[in-house]
Amino acid sequence: MTEKTLASPKPSEIPIANNFKKVFRQYGGILSGMVVLIILFSFINDSFFTANNITNIILQVSIIAITAYGMTYVLLLGDINLSVGSTIALIGTFAALGASWGIPFILLVPLSIIAALALGMINGGLTAIAGIPSFIVTVATMGIFRGIAYIVTDGMPIMIKDDAFLALGNGEFLYIPIPIWILIILLLINHFILTKTTFGRKIYITGGNKEAAIYSGINVTRLKIKVFMITAVLAGISGMILASRLYSGQPNSALSYELDAIAAAVLGGTSLNGGYGTVVGTVIGALTIGVINNGMNLMNVPYFYQMVVKGLVILVAVYFDVRNKRKRS
């Protein structure tokens, strides 16, 4: 009777090892950078690496991250949406006005989402059907949406007194702020959509090669409209959370949030040329920006210098995006 010996599997043959390598290859750079920043700011200021401050960082980036989830969809198609900041302001003021008219919060949520869908349909229709470049369309609607927010409010903030509405941005569940729960839930939902559904695969295929997508039977026009609608809905959710946190709908809120959303997505590995990126990378990018902002605030760095740093971060992220594109091609 002979004895059979089983060969030990190589590390590359172990699923867990493969998954770890894949995750590290995809997110290792940005995660390493974030860890270095956390260590640096922790040495500079003792109050940085505390439970309260870490929670505060996540809470502060939640609105940008949720908006950036939507931006990821658009960038994956090779388009862009510069109207998300104005969408946040308009939906926030819309919801605040509804609350001031006595509309129950349980009705305000679907009404605000429907309003956001309409804004997304405008952007998507002008881009996909009229054939106007998304950059031009969303620059125009950025001004239009913001202008409407000023018109309906007479340029004044609309105070929110509805307790349920205020709980959206300021309440807690199991000692964790509600915006963080929303951030996590939307991360899981959008990650599932992009990685496990036919709709998500169509987005990657279209962003990677539009001609091939058309030849394979994908209705690119319909897909693009849906993507812009999703982006608007996520911006609308951010708008309701921001209005709640500010205790008012403000037409001048969310200024330059579109740049923060783009920075988070690109820093997290989403390509500006389409076809490559994930919402997991996007949330890591948003958290990295949050760490930078929080660290500089604790160091009392003036806001104008923070703008310079944020601009440099975007430039570096775009540089690596271009370099990675050359490698992939």
List the predicted regions and their residue ranges.
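Hydrophobic core segments of alpha-helical transmembrane domains in multi-pass membrane transport
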Residues: 30-42, 71, 146, 182-192, ...
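Membrane-interfacial amphipathic/re-entrant helices at transmembrane-helix boundaries
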Residues: 2-66, 102-107, 218, 226
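Transmembrane alpha-helical segments in multi-pass inner-membrane proteins
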Residues: 235, 245-311
